[in-house]
Each structure stands twice: as structure tokens, then as C-alpha cells.
Amino acid sequence: KKHPTSAGLLMFGNEYDIVREFNAYFLDYQEQYDADTRWTDRIISSSGDWSGNVYDFYFRIYNRLIQDIKVPFRMDGGNRVDDTPVHQALREALANCLVNADYYGRQGLVILKKRDGITMSNPGSFRIELDAAKSGGVSDPRNGTMLKMFNLIDIGERAGSGIPNIFRVWREQGWAAPTFTEQLEPERT
């Protein structure tokens, strides 16, 4: 009997099938714009009104993350360019969060968007030293096949350049440097 790989199931399966293999699988996106409200909007993998898989989550959430990004007028040849370095950095950050999650971990993945920042949190520890990740050149994805699937649609490069690029883009924007934290019980980044 044929069946998908774990990466195929996570990327393209339905949530009700995914949780049979990954019991704690849960993807959660929250917009928190009002301090008096738990969330202004929320998308969760278990809602039942969409597939709940990683691939569909990526595109639903990426489109939410970029809504407030300014796009200055720029032409390349005769075509308008709407893709900025900030867009590229957000794609990289979101893909990194998804492909480096430990889907067997005890807690789900959470993306939190507030007026003044974005927090991305996934189950699992950081697989390389943080200083090495910031310096670049080291790629050790937890879910390499998922990363390859993203690479096939031009998201990510598997060159270990994503985190340094995110820091560079934030610096060029004059924003505070991103922060990384690692919690060990339960493992969370």
C-alpha cells in the first residue's frame, strides 16, 4: 500500500490525517491588535474549514504578514516590482519556522502578529549554535524534505543564509534586531 512520506503528509495532507501521525500537530496564527481582546483574528489548523496542512498555512499566513509592508514604486525593465527585501525576509522566516519545527513535539507552532512586531515560535530546540546561525553558511534543517519542497517553489535556499539576511534587512529598515530565544522544557524556539 502506498502512502505519503511524513513530509508529504505535513505539507499536503489534511489535518485530521496529520494528527494521526503527529498527535500534537497544531498550527496557530493570531493577530493581536487590541490589548483588551485575546485576538483580533485567528487561523488554526484544526478549524475544519481548510486543509490545515503546512503548505496551505504558509500561504494563508504569509499573505497576512505582508499586508502592512510598504511597497515603494520600482520598475525592472517594463515590469513593476512588488517584492521587497522585507517580503523576502518574511518568507524566509516563516519557512524556517515551519521546516524546523519538531512536529512530534509537545506543543504546536504559533505565529503572533502585533502592531509592533511578529513572533514565530515552534516546538523543538535550535539545531545549530545561535552564533553560527547568525553568521550564516550552516544549514541543518529538521525537516529537509519539506525544505526541498519549499525550494522547488523558490522559497528558501538551504545555504544557511536566511537568518543573516533577516538581520541585514531589519538593520537596513532601521528596525530593532530580531531576537531568538530557546526554551528547553518543553523544547521550543
Task: Pin down the residues of each PLM region.
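Glycine-rich/acidic phosphate-handling loop/turn and adjacent ATP-lid/helix
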Residues: I118-D154
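Bergerat-fold GHKL/Histidine-kinase-like ATPase
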Residues: K1-D116, N151, I155-S161, R171-P186
